[in-house]
Amino acid sequence: VLIRVLANLLLLQLSYAQESSELVIGGDECDINEHPFLVALHTARSKRFHCAGTLLNKEWVLTAARCDMENMQIYLGLHNISRPNQDQKRRVPKEKHFCVSSKTYTRWDKDIMLIRLKRPVNDGTHIAPLSLPSNPPSVGSVCRIMGWGSITTTKVTYPDVPHCANIKLFDYSVCRDAYKGLPEKSRTLCAGILEGGIDSCKVDNGGPLICNGQFQGIGSWEGHPCAQPLKPALYTNVFEYTDWIEGIIARNTTVTCPP
């Protein structure tokens, strides 16, 4: 029965891809002006980026809890890692906020980290914030993913520039069918391309999922290898955490994370 259900979903996805010019099979280099809110995270000793994140305002960045690391450095306004933009900035964290310890999140719950920068950044040609969502995401939405993650699945190939692609938002049950052990309910989103070939991948964790123009998800977990058929990725549902995020930013000491 499960195989038949997944096969029907695959046929629906193939039909959708044929009808919608917005869907792509493989990612391409992002336009340099498309991602002023996208940030790159790495350690001072690392030569490659560890994760991505999203600038919410001049002081705050939102990413995944799994992206926590020592000696974190945050790059803003970055496009080509080999040719820095003139307005590119580097910052370090002043504060880190978690729903739970960065060591006890799960792939289906509370994989979220809010970072306050030690020094604010001003808007620029390649630096600008992305607002929190005003509405919850809708199943069937076309969503945009982006990051400096691996662009190949059989071996790790990191690009110098971020790649962007469109994927589709599915009902959470699709990911439950694909990955055994997921709970019946979760504050995560399920998104991808059911025929495979496009997905978030290594180092894209923490980056944004933008659906119908709204920041709806944080890259959390994908199948291994990436971009396999019938294996969508999981994204932390940003809308479910907006009260917590806004409370932390407003310095509300009584705000609590969703149970």
From Swiss-Prot:
Signal peptide residues on this chain, from the entry's feature table: 1-17
Residues with attached carbohydrate: 80, 252
Cellular localization per UniProt: Secreted
Cellular compartments per GO CC: extracellular region; secretory granule
Broad class of the protein's primary localization: secreted
Keyword Transport: no
Maturation-removed propeptide residues: 18-23
Annotated ranges, domain Peptidase S1: 24-250
Gene3D superfamilies reported for this sequence: Trypsin-like serine proteases
Protein keywords: Disulfide bond, Glycoprotein, Hemostasis impairing toxin, Secreted, Serine protease homolog, Signal, Toxin
Disulphide bridges: 30-164, 51-67, 99-257, 143-211, 175-190, 201-226
Tissue: Expressed by the venom gland.
GO function terms (MF aspect): serine-type endopeptidase activity; toxin activity
A Pfam match: Trypsin
GO biological process: proteolysis
InterPro entries referenced in this protein's UniProt entry, alphabetically: Peptidase_S1_PA (IPR009003), Peptidase_S1_PA_chymotrypsin (IPR043504), Peptidase_S1A (IPR001314), Trypsin_dom (IPR001254)
Coiled coil: none
Protein family membership: Belongs to the peptidase S1 family. Snake venom subfamily.
Function noted in UniProt: Snake venom serine protease homolog that may act in the hemostasis system of the prey.
Stored PANTHER family: KALLIKREIN-1, KALLIKREIN-RELATED
Protein name as it appears in the record: Snake venom serine protease homolog rhinocerase 3
Organism, scientific name: Bitis rhinoceros
Lineage of origin: Eukaryota, Metazoa, Chordata, Craniata, Vertebrata
